[in-house]
């Protein structure tokens, strides 16, 4: 008997909603990445996108443990000389809380074309409103 590999056409994509109100960033990001990859399903195959869509709400209410709010730094570079920009977690949470969640989850996904496809299924919003009510997302408890 040979091992069965999931086919992209056979995979049913579900929608999940995650409320990050009071949740720890890293613990929530690992669970979100697991669902995006499809590791929660019995038909998981590493070479096939078996993951589901994840809608994250209340991104601005996520917590970080210890003194990471002031000590954890995020860097980006514009490509121009002197173009290095840096911000700590508190500044990121104040200006772009969606990017803080996205960066944490993206680092936990594969660094290839399949990982980019998985990352596109992540939808992050500040506040509790989102435009995906028509998909009837299921509650994902973290």
From Swiss-Prot:
Q: Which Pfam families match?
A: Ribosomal_L13
Q: Does the keyword Ribosomal protein apply?
A: yes
Tell me which InterPro entries the record gives. Ribosomal_uL13 (IPR005822), Ribosomal_uL13_bac-type (IPR005823), Ribosomal_uL13_CS (IPR023563), Ribosomal_uL13_sf (IPR036899)
Say which domain of life the source belongs to: Bacteria
Q: Which Gene3D superfamilies match?
A: Ribosomal protein L13 (3.90.1180.10)
Of the GO CC terms on this record, one is: cytosolic large ribosomal subunit
What GO molecular function annotation could you give as one example from this UniProt entry? mRNA binding
User: Its biological function?
Assistant: This protein is one of the early assembly proteins of the 50S ribosomal subunit, although it is not seen to bind rRNA by itself. It is important during the early stages of 50S assembly.
Which HAMAP family does this chain map to? Ribosomal_uL13 (MF_01366)
- Give the family this protein belongs to, as stated in its UniProt record: Belongs to the universal ribosomal protein uL13 family.
Recorded protein name is Large ribosomal subunit protein uL13
């Amino acid at each position: 008997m040979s091992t069965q590999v999931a086919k992209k056409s056979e995979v049913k994509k579900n929608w999940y909603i995650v409320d990050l109100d009071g949740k720890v960033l890293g613990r929530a990001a690992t669970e979100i990445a697991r669902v995006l990859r499809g590791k929660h399903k019995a038909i998981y195959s590493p070479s096939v996108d078996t993951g589901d869509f994840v809608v994250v709400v209340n991104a601005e209410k996520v917590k970080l443990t210890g003194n990471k709010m002031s000590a954890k730094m995020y860097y980006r570079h514009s490509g121009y000389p002197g173009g290095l920009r840096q911000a700590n977690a508190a500044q990121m949470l104040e200006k772009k809380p969606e990017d803080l969640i996205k960066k944490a989850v993206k680092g936990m996904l594969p660094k290839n074309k399949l990982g980019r496809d998985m990352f596109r299924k992540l939808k992050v919003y500040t506040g509790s409103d989102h435009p995906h009510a028509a998909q009837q997302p299921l509650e994902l408890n973290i």
